[in-house]
Design a protein with these regions (language model features):
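N-terminal Lys/Arg-rich, disordered targeting/topogenic segments
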Residues: 1-11
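Feature for secretory/organellar precursors and membrane-associated catalytic proteins
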Residues: 12-15, 21, 25-138
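Extracytoplasmic/periplasmic terminal helices and flexible tails
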Residues: 59, 158-160, 170-188
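Active-site environment of divalent metal-dependent phosphoester hydrolases
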Residues: 62, 153-154
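PRPP/pyrophosphate-binding module of the type I phosphoribosyltransferase fold
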Residues: 145
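Phosphate/adenylate-binding glycine loop and adjacent helical scaffold
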Residues: 148
Length: 188
């Protein structure tokens, strides 16, 4: 009889342990790190279509709490701004772009080059000149200017305007697929 009771307790403890691990994994995914995949070519050459990445979700919340902003050139994942949800984007979808402007910055595109506060921005990840012009834009308070690395084929701030910082979900941390490209996503 005691061996049956012992087996039941052991089985019960195993289930409790498994449940605890599942809850920890869900909590980590919900609050700390989340896997995502790249659905479009807007971040080529940095990220390719179908790449799998991990995003870190704590920093944007800490930044907002202490009224800080992401670093320039950080690759961020965010909920679509209102203008995109009004034309059919789901509130549950996510976009990925690079931060090129912070609140108070003046952003401009002239002769295929991006300028921030009157200075040309050096961007070694951009493979071709920008195929559009954009007069000087002032980035509003609590907003960011975000652009895809594939600037001529990206639905980004140059089309829909500044991104509210409250829309940030996380920052790109590392690529885990394909295996030959596994590693951190670096920012100069």
């Amino acid at each position: 009889m005691s061996s049956t009771g012992s087996k039941k307790n052991k089985t019960k403890n195993n289930w409790k342990g498994l449940l605890i691990w599942i809850l920890i994994a869900l909590l980590l995914r919900w609050q700390v790190v989340e896997p995502r995949w790249i659905p479009s070519g807007s971040m080529i050459p940095t990220l390719q279509i179908q790449d799998r990445i991990l995003i870190e979700k704590i920093t944007p919340r800490i930044n907002q709490k202490f009224n800080k902003h992401p670093r320039l050139n950080t690759v961020v994942i965010f909920k679509p701004p209102k203008i995109l949800t009004e034309v059919g984007y789901s509130d549950g979808s996510a976009l990925i772009k690079r931060v090129v402007g912070l609140p108070g910055d003046r952003i401009e595109v002239t002769d295929g080059k991006l300028y921030r506060n009157g200075k040309e921005i050096y961007e070694p990840w951009i493979k071709e000149p920008l195929g559009y012009e954009m007069g000087e834009i002032y980035v509003p308070e609590y907003s960011l200017w975000v652009l895809g690395d594939n600037r001529n084929n990206s639905l980004d701030s140059h089309i829909w305007g500044a991104l509210p910082e409250k829309n940030l979900i996380g920052t790109a941390l590392a690529r885990y697929w394909p295996l030959k490209k596994i590693g951190p996503i670096r920012f100069p």
